[in-house]
């Protein structure tokens, strides 16, 4: 236990020292050039905020969902070593079915179609 406390203390002290040094070291000389908006070396001609396509947002959300599904399924082979392996497989299958139904719903609603 003393080893854990000493490692924790060293970590806190080292991170505090690094945080204090990071505030002292940089040269903080903000001028008009550094405070102005920068867009690829040119002055912005119009609004820099373009409308974001909802299609990209939907694909990103679907990617996150199925990325989490893969993370869930990677640990599944070790699930048979648990006390109640049947329960583990039941809940993993339930999550897999739920995500599959969500994908089918998204597909039938046209969320994966790029052309209108």
UniProtKB/Swiss-Prot annotation:
<comment type="function">
    <text>Core subunit of the mitochondrial membrane respiratory chain NADH dehydrogenase (Complex I) that is believed to belong to the minimal assembly required for catalysis. Complex I functions in the transfer of electrons from NADH to the respiratory chain. The immediate electron acceptor for the enzyme is believed to be ubiquinone.</text>
</comment>
<keyword id="KW-0249">Electron transport</keyword>
<dbReference type="GO" id="GO:0008137">
    <property type="term" value="F:NADH dehydrogenase (ubiquinone) activity"/>
</dbReference>
<keyword id="KW-1278">Translocase</keyword>
<keyword id="KW-0520">NAD</keyword>
<comment type="similarity">
    <text>Belongs to the complex I subunit 3 family.</text>
</comment>
<dbReference type="Pfam" id="PF00507">
    <property type="entry name" value="Oxidored_q4"/>
</dbReference>
<keyword id="KW-0472">Membrane</keyword>
<feature type="transmembrane region" description="Helical">
    <location>
        <begin position="3"/>
        <end position="23"/>
    </location>
</feature>
<keyword id="KW-0813">Transport</keyword>
<dbReference type="GO" id="GO:0030964">
    <property type="term" value="C:NADH dehydrogenase complex"/>
</dbReference>
<protein>
    <recommendedName>
        <fullName>NADH-ubiquinone oxidoreductase chain 3</fullName>
        <ecNumber>7.1.1.2</ecNumber>
    </recommendedName>
</protein>
<feature type="transmembrane region" description="Helical">
    <location>
        <begin position="85"/>
        <end position="105"/>
    </location>
</feature>
<keyword id="KW-0679">Respiratory chain</keyword>
<keyword id="KW-0496">Mitochondrion</keyword>
<keyword id="KW-0830">Ubiquinone</keyword>
<dbReference type="InterPro" id="IPR038430">
    <property type="entry name" value="NDAH_ubi_oxred_su3_sf"/>
</dbReference>
<keyword id="KW-1133">Transmembrane helix</keyword>
<feature type="transmembrane region" description="Helical">
    <location>
        <begin position="56"/>
        <end position="76"/>
    </location>
</feature>
<dbReference type="InterPro" id="IPR000440">
    <property type="entry name" value="NADH_UbQ/plastoQ_OxRdtase_su3"/>
</dbReference>
<dbReference type="GO" id="GO:0031966">
    <property type="term" value="C:mitochondrial membrane"/>
</dbReference>
<keyword id="KW-0812">Transmembrane</keyword>
